[in-house]
């Protein structure tokens, strides 16, 4: 009996030791990669354009694509941009889609077809502008067959990606202006193109203007545009570095937050505009430029990266080619360098090089962002907090899944990437490099993509050395 008791005590001691050993081993495990509360996979809302490479490739668009001038004035030669040389220049910048140019199929069919041919050659998708189609907005009884009879002229080109519909449609209560683009008339044609013919249509909304007076009207405007046109992609053009805005970034973020929320409600993506220069000249006036030209590189990068952190699944640069009247000056006659990735005389401006660098980075991260769902944004630091005070998508806890805290002046976009945590970290400062520190709830295996270069680390804490305005992608493996 005594021997039996000793045997049971021995077995009990061994069992207790095994429990303690197992418990200690569990404490040392990666508490992130084996979490029971990891996210379920969600379907991304990104639009897939097969010619660009499908859903893994982010549309990087140019607004005002190649057009034909081909004449001389004041000792300058204004070239024909619809050539191999300029399409190669566009491709080298990382642009893969042209959504609008001054070339209209109704007036210049041979030039539109040349654009499409060069698009095929250089891997650049084209949205076609055709007044033969757009003029049908005034016909409420227009049929799919009538529209298809026009599209047959160019829709077989592999580079044909859709139709240009309208830029900044107007309403009777918001930005009526000349009344030439009143919203209601676009509903029928949009339905025929998008629903009946499955053609992607390009349309772009006004930004909020004079928000103090127009906030409710603008919200109504966005809702009505969506109900009327039923867009497959939501676009708007807010340029944060226009001098008259006086650096009020809270309105920039409010507008983007509204677009993000609206896109989420309608289960569509949003594409954001990035300003390639400034000092626009819609009124075709002669004036001298402010210098230095703006935005500078860190401001430009900040513009792109904050949009990506909020979940943008398309980037649009305006203008790609500088319109002739955007170069009008007073004392010097012309200024080819104050706006446009490419100036009127074919010169590469500073924003060409900024965009080229940024687009290389996007090409290294777009598979993740295009297959992710944005779950909100963490802000860290006083300036970022002040500027996003009107923003509804902020994660107030400052934590997300395995991420427990962020230190530094930063924005962190939080994403569900096929059930994994992805984070897009932005140095919020446009003036200074910073160390941004992220702390996790256990040892994590982290893929880092910075300056288009990939690296891998394991750790509970991560310190990122980030240039002003820079964005870095993290994926927790």
Region spans (language model):
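Short, conserved catalytic or interaction motifs in soluble domains
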Residues: 26
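C-terminal motif of bacterial Sec signal peptides marking the signal peptidase cleavage site
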Residues: 22-23
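Bacterial N-terminal signal peptides that target proteins for export
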Residues: 2-12
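N-terminal secretory targeting modules
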Residues: 13, 31-34
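Glycan-processing catalytic domains of CAZymes
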Residues: 35-442, 450-477
